[in-house]
Regions:
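Short, surface-exposed charged micro-motifs
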Residues: 21, 50, 59, 66, ...
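A cytosolic small-molecule/anion-sensing beta-strand core signal
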Residues: 26, 54-55, 70-71, 89
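Short, conserved beta-strand element in jelly-roll/cupin
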Residues: 34-35, 44-61
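Short beta-strand His + acidic residue motifs that chelate non-heme Fe in jelly-roll/DSBH
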Residues: 42, 60-61, 77, 82-88, ...
Length: 119
């Protein structure tokens, strides 16, 4: 059992929308990701996602509304719900989701990351 220092882990990478695995528990992955700018519209057929903001804030856009998630807050996006993260400034986010979750969900494009790195 070892503790994880999020500040130190986030300092190990600079890419946006490229999740890194920081831990695993019960089939779930703890992923660290930096957002800046809009991501691709997508949904996940089989997985819910939890987005916890460590630093900064971002807007989670849905087709019918936009929700601002600030530092210290989280949002759970249920499976099947189309969404798109969008950050005006860089934001640091912790994701909790099944290990099989593809970052772009039902969409395959240049933002899709098939093999996640570890920090």
């Amino acid at each position: 059992m070892e503790k994880v220092n999020l500040t130190e882990k986030f300092s190990q990478f600079s890419e946006h929308y490229s999740p890194k695995i920081a831990g695993e528990l019960n089939g779930q992955m703890v992923k660290l990701v930096k957002f800046k700018g809009p991501f691709v519209w997508h949904h996940h057929d089989n997985e819910d996602e939890l987005f916890y903001v460590v630093r900064g804030s971002f807007e989670m856009e849905f087709r019918d509304k936009t929700v601002t998630i600030n530092e210290g807050e989280f949002i759970i996006v249920p499976r099947g719900v189309e969404h798109r993260p969008n950050a005006k400034e860089e934001v640091h986010v912790v994701l909790f989701e099944p290990g099989t979750t593809l970052n772009t969900g039902n969409v395959k494009n240049e933002m899709t990351i098939d093999n996640l790195g570890r920090v």
